[in-house]
Amino acid sequence: MSSDELKRQAAAVALEQVRDGMKLGLGTGSTAKHFVELLGAKVQGGLQVVGVPTSEVTRADAERCGIPLATLDEVDHLDLTVDGADEIDPALNLVKGGGGALLREKIVAAASGRMIVIADDSKLVETLGRFPLPIEVIPFGLAATRRAIEQALAVCGIDGELKLRNGKDGHAFVTDGGHWIVDAHLGRIPDAPRLAGLLSVIPGIVEHGLFIGLASSVVLASPHGIRIIERPACRDSGESK
């Protein structure tokens, strides 16, 4: 079974949580695209939902699938966000942003009552850091921002390499918000919450790809079946899978 087939299976399980009248955050990336396509088929069958896309790419996909869309300014809350992840640890902390949409993804996730992460089982890791950590930055003063990032990494005992992400044209990749992305190749992040806190206070950083405490549950698809992992706080509150 291909990775693409596994992603679609995970998306189908997440779709079971969608109810008529919900306001949904629509993630970005190859896995989230499967969810958007499956959701679109349900909408064509009469399901009534409103989606808030996390990128212009997702907006185009959702429009193509006939999903009614809104902005966060036009809805008072989001019931659920469904999105993928580049890495997931056992505490359901995430690395996201490989597709470059981390800022809007985090804003939408934080505005949601629940966040379901969908992925194939290769994304579950013991410790975050194997996948490069995306850090969205302001172009102005980039050298100073890089030095501050390096200092934060040193405080956490991490010796990493920072690389400015380039687009297909060979120039700096530009996010939907007009920013650049520095990918931090770290190998291992021993204390993700601590690093997230240090990065969050650096002037010049718009947002980083560590999603701490935002995922309510994770749907992992493997050749052996579906595994659902819930964040302990969600289990304690009786939140349904």
Swiss-Prot record:
Pathway assigned in UniProt: Carbohydrate degradation; pentose phosphate pathway; D-ribose 5-phosphate from D-ribulose 5-phosphate (non-oxidative stage): step 1/1
GO biological process: pentose-phosphate shunt, non-oxidative branch
Known EC number: 5.3.1.6
Protein encoded by which gene: rpiA
Stated family: Belongs to the ribose 5-phosphate isomerase family.
Active site: 105
Cited InterPro entries: NagB/RpiA_transferase-like, Ribose-5P_isomerase, Ribose5P_isomerase_typA_subgr, Ribose5P_isomerase_type_A
Catalytic activity, as annotated: aldehydo-D-ribose 5-phosphate = D-ribulose 5-phosphate
Key words, A-Z: Isomerase
Subunit note: Homodimer.
Purpose of the protein: Catalyzes the reversible conversion of ribose-5-phosphate to ribulose 5-phosphate.
Protein's name in the database: Ribose-5-phosphate isomerase A
Gene Ontology molecular function, alphabetical: ribose-5-phosphate isomerase activity
Entry annotated with the keyword Cell inner membrane: no
Taxonomic superkingdom: Bacteria
Keyword Isomerase part of the UniProt annotation: yes
Binding-site residues for substrate, renumbered to this chain: 28-31, 83-86, 96-99, 123
